[in-house]
Amino acid sequence: MSDVADPRPLISAGSASAPPRFHMLAKPSGSTCNLDCTYCFFLSKEALYPNEASRMTEATLEAYIAQLLESHRTPEVTVAWQGGEPTLMGLDFFARSVELVEKHKRPEQRIEYTMQTNGVLLDDAWGAFLAEHGFLVGLSVDGPQRMHDAYRVNRGGQGT
């Protein structure tokens, strides 16, 4: 008899036909951001690849979505966007991503969308789009305004 516990209870939520859900996160704008937060480790990454585009192309977007949806064997799939700052890709990019999800999803798949953003570029058009498609939006805020503005600054050093 082994001293190792049976791992099957850890994965019992799935079965051979429906394994447990997994979550994939896309960073379509790479490390590009419209802020210059004092504690950010990500901004310096841009300098590591000065000759490479950091924006996801439409061909890459379609391949990513097709592979993401094909690889999920559960009825619920989360399409998650993060950055840098994902809204720098523009609203048209995300509208296209929703179109591509509709094109590639299987009939039984239910899609959930999430986005983590600093919110600087959000406006009424973004709000309408995110609401229409049921996005769960995480908004990055660092506490009270004086604390937030001390750390989350724009490229001119001003609080956001």
What positions do the PLM features span?
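Radical SAM/AdoMet-radical enzyme domain recognition
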Residues: 65-66, 70-80, 89-160
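N-terminal [4Fe-4S]-dependent radical SAM core
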Residues: 1-26, 44, 72-74
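Pocket-edge positions in alpha/beta enzyme catalytic cores
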Residues: 52-56, 86, 156-157
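A short acidic, glycine/proline-enriched capping/turn motif at secondary-structure boundaries
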Residues: 31, 47, 86-87, 120-122
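Short glycine-centered, acidic/aromatic-flanked micro-motifs in structured strand/loop junctions
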Residues: 28, 83-84, 117
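Canonical Radical SAM [4Fe-4S] cluster-binding loop centered on the CxxxCxxC motif
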Residues: 19-59
